[in-house]
Protein backbone atom coordinates (compact mmCIF):
# COMPACT_ATOMS: atom_id res chain seq x y z
CA UNK A 1 0.00 0.00 0.00
CA UNK A 2 1.00 3.57 -0.58
CA UNK A 3 0.26 6.88 1.08
CA UNK A 4 -0.83 9.71 -1.19
CA UNK A 5 -0.69 13.28 0.08
CA UNK A 6 -2.53 16.09 -1.70
CA UNK A 7 -1.11 19.41 -0.58
CA UNK A 8 -3.60 21.95 -1.88
CA UNK A 9 -3.97 25.69 -1.56
CA UNK A 10 -6.54 25.30 1.20
CA UNK A 11 -6.08 21.77 2.58
CA UNK A 12 -3.90 18.72 3.15
CA UNK A 13 -5.46 15.33 2.34
CA UNK A 14 -3.65 12.12 3.25
CA UNK A 15 -4.90 8.77 1.97
CA UNK A 16 -3.88 5.13 1.99
CA UNK A 17 -4.29 3.60 -1.46
CA UNK A 18 -4.13 -0.07 -2.46
CA UNK A 19 -2.65 -1.51 -5.67
CA UNK A 20 -5.98 -1.03 -7.51
CA UNK A 21 -6.07 2.68 -6.69
CA UNK A 22 -8.82 2.26 -4.10
CA UNK A 23 -8.64 4.71 -1.19
CA UNK A 24 -8.67 2.65 2.02
CA UNK A 25 -8.51 5.54 4.48
CA UNK A 26 -8.46 9.33 4.16
CA UNK A 27 -7.63 12.14 6.59
CA UNK A 28 -8.04 15.86 5.79
CA UNK A 29 -7.11 19.18 7.34
CA UNK A 30 -7.89 22.72 6.21
CA UNK A 31 -4.91 25.08 5.95
CA UNK A 32 -5.20 28.57 7.34
CA UNK A 33 -3.43 31.56 5.85
CA UNK A 34 -0.16 32.05 7.67
CA UNK A 35 3.36 33.13 6.99
CA UNK A 36 5.64 30.78 5.06
CA UNK A 37 7.52 29.39 8.07
CA UNK A 38 4.27 28.57 9.87
CA UNK A 39 2.82 26.87 6.78
CA UNK A 40 5.95 24.75 6.30
CA UNK A 41 5.99 23.68 9.96
CA UNK A 42 2.25 22.94 9.94
CA UNK A 43 2.58 20.85 6.77
CA UNK A 44 5.56 18.88 8.10
CA UNK A 45 4.02 18.20 11.52
CA UNK A 46 0.69 17.11 10.06
CA UNK A 47 2.26 14.82 7.44
CA UNK A 48 4.73 13.25 9.89
CA UNK A 49 2.10 12.66 12.58
CA UNK A 50 -0.44 11.10 10.22
CA UNK A 51 2.03 9.16 8.08
CA UNK A 52 3.43 7.51 11.22
CA UNK A 53 -0.10 6.72 12.39
CA UNK A 54 -1.00 5.15 9.03
CA UNK A 55 2.30 3.24 8.89
CA UNK A 56 1.37 1.55 12.19
CA UNK A 57 -1.96 0.44 10.71
CA UNK A 58 -0.85 -0.53 7.18
CA UNK A 59 2.26 -1.87 5.43
CA UNK A 60 3.27 1.26 3.50
CA UNK A 61 5.83 0.90 0.69
CA UNK A 62 6.16 4.58 -0.26
CA UNK A 63 4.70 8.06 0.05
CA UNK A 64 3.78 10.35 -2.84
CA UNK A 65 3.16 14.06 -2.42
CA UNK A 66 1.14 16.07 -4.95
CA UNK A 67 1.61 19.84 -4.76
CA UNK A 68 0.61 22.74 -7.01
CA UNK A 69 3.43 24.55 -8.75
CA UNK A 70 6.94 23.72 -9.87
CA UNK A 71 8.73 20.86 -8.11
CA UNK A 72 11.77 18.69 -8.70
CA UNK A 73 12.62 15.29 -7.23
CA UNK A 74 12.87 16.46 -3.65
CA UNK A 75 11.73 20.05 -3.24
CA UNK A 76 9.13 22.64 -4.10
CA UNK A 77 10.82 25.12 -6.41
CA UNK A 78 7.82 27.46 -6.31
CA UNK A 79 4.20 27.09 -5.29
CA UNK A 80 2.49 30.45 -5.72
CA UNK A 81 -0.80 29.42 -4.11
CA UNK A 82 0.92 28.04 -1.01
CA UNK A 83 3.51 30.82 -0.84
CA UNK A 84 6.38 28.31 -0.86
CA UNK A 85 9.72 28.64 -2.59
CA UNK A 86 12.82 26.39 -2.46
CA UNK A 87 11.13 24.27 0.20
CA UNK A 88 13.04 21.02 0.78
CA UNK A 89 10.01 19.05 1.94
CA UNK A 90 11.31 15.58 1.04
CA UNK A 91 14.57 16.10 2.94
CA UNK A 92 12.69 17.32 6.01
CA UNK A 93 10.23 14.41 5.94
CA UNK A 94 12.84 11.69 5.22
CA UNK A 95 14.57 12.44 8.52
CA UNK A 96 11.37 11.39 10.34
CA UNK A 97 9.77 8.83 7.98
CA UNK A 98 11.75 5.82 6.77
CA UNK A 99 10.03 4.98 3.46
CA UNK A 100 10.74 6.36 -0.02
CA UNK A 101 9.08 9.74 -0.60
CA UNK A 102 8.36 11.22 -4.04
CA UNK A 103 6.99 14.62 -4.96
CA UNK A 104 5.27 15.75 -8.16
CA UNK A 105 3.04 18.52 -9.48
CA UNK A 106 -0.58 17.92 -8.39
CA UNK A 107 -2.15 18.21 -11.85
CA UNK A 108 0.33 15.64 -13.19
CA UNK A 109 -0.55 13.29 -10.30
CA UNK A 110 -4.28 13.70 -10.88
CA UNK A 111 -3.90 13.08 -14.63
CA UNK A 112 -1.88 9.90 -14.01
CA UNK A 113 -4.44 8.66 -11.47
CA UNK A 114 -7.42 9.31 -13.75
CA UNK A 115 -5.58 7.75 -16.71
CA UNK A 116 -4.70 4.65 -14.69
CA UNK A 117 -7.77 4.12 -12.49
CA UNK A 118 -10.43 6.67 -13.34
CA UNK A 119 -12.51 8.31 -16.02
CA UNK A 120 -9.64 8.59 -18.54
CA UNK A 121 -8.47 4.97 -18.49
CA UNK A 122 -10.13 4.12 -21.81
CA UNK A 123 -8.45 7.05 -23.60
CA UNK A 124 -4.94 7.14 -25.10
CA UNK A 125 -4.79 10.94 -25.29
CA UNK A 126 -6.27 13.50 -22.96
CA UNK A 127 -5.89 16.98 -21.56
CA UNK A 128 -6.55 17.12 -17.84
CA UNK A 129 -7.40 20.35 -16.01
CA UNK A 130 -7.46 20.92 -12.27
CA UNK A 131 -9.65 23.64 -10.81
CA UNK A 132 -9.12 24.49 -7.16
CA UNK A 133 -7.32 27.32 -5.44
CA UNK A 134 -5.49 27.60 -8.76
CA UNK A 135 -5.81 26.17 -12.26
CA UNK A 136 -3.41 23.50 -13.49
CA UNK A 137 -3.25 20.84 -16.12
CA UNK A 138 -1.43 17.93 -17.67
CA UNK A 139 -1.38 16.17 -21.03
CA UNK A 140 -1.51 12.41 -21.61
CA UNK A 141 -0.27 11.07 -24.99
CA UNK A 142 -0.28 7.33 -25.76
CA UNK A 143 -1.24 6.60 -22.13
CA UNK A 144 1.90 8.43 -20.89
CA UNK A 145 2.26 11.77 -19.17
CA UNK A 146 3.79 14.43 -21.42
CA UNK A 147 7.15 14.98 -19.72
CA UNK A 148 7.73 18.64 -18.96
CA UNK A 149 10.70 17.93 -16.70
CA UNK A 150 10.74 20.11 -13.60
CA UNK A 151 8.27 22.50 -15.17
CA UNK A 152 4.84 22.45 -13.56
CA UNK A 153 3.03 20.96 -16.54
CA UNK A 154 0.22 22.82 -18.23
CA UNK A 155 -0.24 25.57 -15.67
CA UNK A 156 -2.81 27.45 -17.69
CA UNK A 157 -3.76 29.45 -14.62
CA UNK A 158 -0.59 31.49 -15.02
CA UNK A 159 -0.88 32.06 -18.76
CA UNK A 160 -1.51 35.74 -19.39
CA UNK A 161 -4.79 36.46 -21.14
CA UNK A 162 -4.60 40.24 -20.75
CA UNK A 163 -1.30 42.07 -21.31
CA UNK A 164 -1.84 44.82 -18.72
CA UNK A 165 -4.33 42.92 -16.61
CA UNK A 166 -4.72 42.30 -12.90
CA UNK A 167 -1.52 41.62 -10.95
CA UNK A 168 -1.24 37.97 -9.85
CA UNK A 169 0.59 36.55 -6.80
CA UNK A 170 3.09 35.02 -9.25
CA UNK A 171 4.22 38.53 -10.23
CA UNK A 172 2.75 38.55 -13.74
CA UNK A 173 -0.21 40.54 -15.00
CA UNK A 174 -3.36 39.15 -16.58
CA UNK A 175 -3.12 35.53 -15.41
CA UNK A 176 -6.15 33.46 -16.43
CA UNK A 177 -6.51 32.24 -12.85
CA UNK A 178 -7.20 35.77 -11.55
CA UNK A 179 -10.18 36.18 -13.89
CA UNK A 180 -11.67 32.79 -13.12
CA UNK A 181 -11.40 33.50 -9.39
CA UNK A 182 -13.02 36.91 -9.83
CA UNK A 183 -15.91 35.29 -11.67
CA UNK A 184 -16.30 32.70 -8.90
CA UNK A 185 -16.20 35.40 -6.19
CA UNK A 186 -18.85 37.46 -8.01
CA UNK A 187 -21.19 34.45 -8.07
CA UNK A 188 -20.73 33.95 -4.31
CA UNK A 189 -21.62 37.57 -3.49
Residues of each region from the PLM?
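Glycine/GP-enriched mid-protein hinge/lid loop-to-helix segment characteristic of carbohydrate kinases
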Residues: 15-18, 26-28, 36-40, 102, ...
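Glycine-rich phosphate-binding loop and adjoining helix at the ATP-binding site
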Residues: 31-48, 52, 58-63, 70-125
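Short glycine-aspartate micro-motif
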Residues: 2-6, 60-64, 126-130, 169
Amino acid sequence: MKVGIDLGGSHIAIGVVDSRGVIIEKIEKRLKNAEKRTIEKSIEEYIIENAKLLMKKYKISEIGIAIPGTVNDDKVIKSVNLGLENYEIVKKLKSKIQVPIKIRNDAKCAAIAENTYGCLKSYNRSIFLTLGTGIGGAVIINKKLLDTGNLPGCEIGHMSIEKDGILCKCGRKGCFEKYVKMSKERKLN
